[in-house]
């Protein structure tokens, strides 16, 4: 839209519209209509209800990767709020191609666990064959991978940490990785507010990067690229202090 002093507001270059909603949201009188944005989907922002800087910093201090998941169930509404928060993260050129899927079926979770174990077994063997002690980035070593596999075969869960809920962030957009990471951060902060522990599933993501990608997509029932995975659960304790950084 274009505004010239003393002249009516004009629509210019309508074909370039990315449906971001900024033109509608900026009008204090709700006087702008957009063919792609129904009126009932436009809501007022209550700036008086914003958290203070101190309150927001307290949230940052409290957020941790607390892997002590209990068997307590998550409320459906809480999960919906976490996912909604993720969808309100910005995306490149407003592509909005981030998809967030909840996985809480025990059989599917078991298959994800087995996928990671199988992939790590193959990675460790390949490293041994090539005579390499660690991956190029130094993140994995053959002994580390073998240790994780052995622990899993002994009945422990160093992969999913016993979670009953995974959020899968997917996007095939060229900026999909960045978009999903932003969505993850929004979702993780909402989880913290709700008293739900969230943990980044790095092992799952690394197995996906180094293993049979289509196999994991089929297990999870997704088509786009897997960019981030979050585990959710009620923690058995909370941290009462934080250490300065």
Tell me what each language-model feature is:
Residues 1-245:
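Acidic, surface-exposed loops and disordered segments
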């Amino acid at each position: 839209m274009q505004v010239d002093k003393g002249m009516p507001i004009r629509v210019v270059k309508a074909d370039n519209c990315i449906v971001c909603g900024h033109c509608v949201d900026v009008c204090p009188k709700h006087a702008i209509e957009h063919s792609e944005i129904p009126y009932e989907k436009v809501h007022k922002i209550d700036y008086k209800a914003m958290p203070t800087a101190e309150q927001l910093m307290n949230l940052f201090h409290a957020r941790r990767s607390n892997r002590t998941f209990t068997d307590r169930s998550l409320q459906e509404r809480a999960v919906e709020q976490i996912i909604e928060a993720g969808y309100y993260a910005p995306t490149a050129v407003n592509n909005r191609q981030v998809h967030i899927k909840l996985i809480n079926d025990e059989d599917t979770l078991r298959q994800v666990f087995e996928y990671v174990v199988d992939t790590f077994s193959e990675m460790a063997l390949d490293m041994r064959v090539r005579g390499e002690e660690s991956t190029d980035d130094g993140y994995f070593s053959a002994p580390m991978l073998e240790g994780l596999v052995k622990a899993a075969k002994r009945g422990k869960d160093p992969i999913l940490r016993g979670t009953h809920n995974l959020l899968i962030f997917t996007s095939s957009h060229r900026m999909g990785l960045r978009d999903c990471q932003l969505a993850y951060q929004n979702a993780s902060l909402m989880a913290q507010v709700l008293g739900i522990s969230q943990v980044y599933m790095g092992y799952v993501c690394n197995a996906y990067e180094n293993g049979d990608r289509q196999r994991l997509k089929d297990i999870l029932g997704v088509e786009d690229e897997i960019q981030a995975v979050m585990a959710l659960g009620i923690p058995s304790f909370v941290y009462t202090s934080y250490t300065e950084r």
